[in-house]
Amino acid sequence: MGQEKLYTEKELSWLSFNERVLQEAADKSNPLIERMRFLGIYSNNLDEFYKVRFADLKRRILINEEQGSAVTSRHLLKKIQSKVVKADQEFDGLYNDLLLEMARNQIFLVNERQISENQQTWLKQYFKQHLRQHITPILINHDTNLVQFLKDDYTYLAVEIIRGQDIAYALLEIPSDKIPRFVNLPPEAPRRRKPMILLDNILRFCLDEIFKGFFDYDALNAYSMKMTRDAEYDLVTEMESSLLELMSSSLKQRLTAEPVRFVYQRDMPDEMVELLRNKLGISNDDSVIAGGRYHNFKDFINFPNVGKSNLVNRPMPRLRHVWFDKFRNGFDAIREQDVLLYYPYHTFEHVLELLRQASFDPSVLAIKINIYRVAKDSRIIDSMIHAAHNGKKVTVVVELQARFDEEANIHWAKSLTAAGVHVIFSAPGLKIHAKLFLISRLENDEIVRYAHIGTGNFNEKTARIYTDYSLLTADARITNEVRRVFNFIENPYRPVTFDNLMVSPQNSRLILYQLIDQEIIHAQAGESAGITLKINNLVDKGLVDRLYSASSAGVKIRLLVRGMCSLIPNMPGISDNIQVTSIVDRFLEHDRVYVFENKGDKLVYLSSADWMTRNIDYRIEVAVSLLDPKLKQRVLDILEILFNDTVKARYIDKELSNRYVPRGNRRKVRAQIAIYDYLKALEQPEQ
């Protein structure tokens, strides 16, 4: 069988994942406002796809053209464009349907032609008080270089300034980074109506306020547009430049990086479309999409809570881990037994509080932590600064190459350094994606270490919407190896060995191959054999091939893959024993769990790494084997709930059909709700 039939192209698989997000917007069992927010998530995801995946494909086409072999990549490009256009049409239909449903619930998202005289007066005043100072027209003439100063993924209004037979053009940036995209209008009778207007439409309504007195014109017409740039870097390793300087210049480069997508309002005049395409240097390989009146739907992720309470998800208050309530401080609790937290069901407050305590505890000598993506107002960063002020030896490993968070991380690195924190940057080309901290504490004249190993970032915001595990432990078998990981980060080319941790790029591929091969041996011997994986992405061909081999040997394999999946299940003789499902629901499934049957004595790993080549071979990632039988069983219980979902689970198949898993005669199980109930029962205080 040819290779092209053994794997799904990762780009098409990624788009299929985003179609599952669109399914959530279409799902009438979801609350109305949550459905509108899923449209925002879909749009945000698609922006990232073009910045990264599509841009990467464009580069491959350029490379292949030089080698005379770009046909396959161009064919994939056409498939992508066709798939996106089809999904966008569905998106537009869903948006219009949701507007009608909103109106039935007395929520009205109006345009500039649907407002009353009182609202018109109010809007002009609002424009003068809040908006005008943020609006400066960009006049388009022969010398205008739009590529240089148009911002990535901002929405602009392209304005026709018409006087007789003459037409001039200008652009207005919609300042949604400074003013809320949704503006509540004064209500009209009946008072229960809740009218809102988009910032875009306020600008359309106030065009005269912007141009009058500066231009002579007979008419002004405005059309929306946006541009997406290539988000990858040209990271050349200049030994005389520090990584911080290199990243800063890379960020500047992104501001002038090549456009990869141009989206414009469908009724924009052809002459204007051509002018903008030429000014932006949009090639035939770039994605040019005629869209609706509004772009940057990602702002709809924050669609306001208006109307009745049943229009949004019912609250799920985050759970406290009752074990911490039994002790004076977090260290006593963790020293007594390992603690496993599962967000967003558990509160992230336990981790924040532990680091706060460490910042002033006289017994704490040193803290080491790595940050990849932290919250905008990070309490973790504050704790590290306070710890340094309190005389602790604080080391923070800052990943400057965390895509889309580089600017924030550069800022944090400078703030930490100014506070006396020892800041370390990763080596160029070796991202640190592990989620670790290590606290060294003097207890009875001995140093006791406390470690955190997680699947997600130290981020208060994402911990409310991403599912992730945190293992907190004082077990020396693990803490000593976490210490070795930090030593490896500081000296990345020095050999180091691990027994209880799987560490990329050191040993992950080797260990994973060995674990899969061991299951093959067990299956061939007629013993209990199986593999269960929960990951975000599965696209590494070496690991996919190993899973195919295991399936062919009779190993039962269950995969829960949220995003990209190159593996094709149910191919006769190749993947008959592999089942792949995906869950998209109110929380983003983000944790990575690997389970190997091991003849009944299951091995359970929590990991920061997806099964992608970059994560296995080119990043620092950490997976930990759970040693506590109770915690191991808890993770296995949660996995069983996920694999028994009958509401939000879809099959991943060769056709990328996203068919829902049929319920049949099984009971209704919505996994995320069931997991919350399961953990809530465990966390009830003892009577």
From Swiss-Prot:
Keyword hit for Metal-binding: yes
Superkingdom: Bacteria
Keywords associated with the record: ATP-binding, Kinase, Magnesium, Metal-binding, Nucleotide-binding, Phosphoprotein, Transferase
Post-translational modification: An intermediate of this reaction is the autophosphorylated ppk in which a phosphate is covalently linked to a histidine residue through a N-P bond.
Names of required cofactors: Mg(2+)
One of the record's GO cellular component terms: polyphosphate kinase complex
PLD phosphodiesterase domain ranges (all copies): 585-615
Residues bound to Mg(2+): 373, 403
GO biological process, one term: polyphosphate biosynthetic process
EC code(s) of this entry: 2.7.4.1
Residues noted as binding ATP in the record, renumbered to the chain: 45, 466, 562, 590
GO MF term list: ATP binding; metal ion binding; polyphosphate kinase activity
Catalytically driven reaction(s): [phosphate](n) + ATP = [phosphate](n+1) + ADP
Catalytic site positions: 433
Biological role stated in the UniProt entry: Catalyzes the reversible transfer of the terminal phosphate of ATP to form a long-chain polyphosphate (polyP).
Family the UniProt entry places it in: Belongs to the polyphosphate kinase 1 (PPK1) family.
HAMAP family: Polyphosphate_kinase (MF_00347)
Protein's name in the database: Polyphosphate kinase
Lineage: Bacteria, Pseudomonadati, Pseudomonadota, Gammaproteobacteria, Enterobacterales
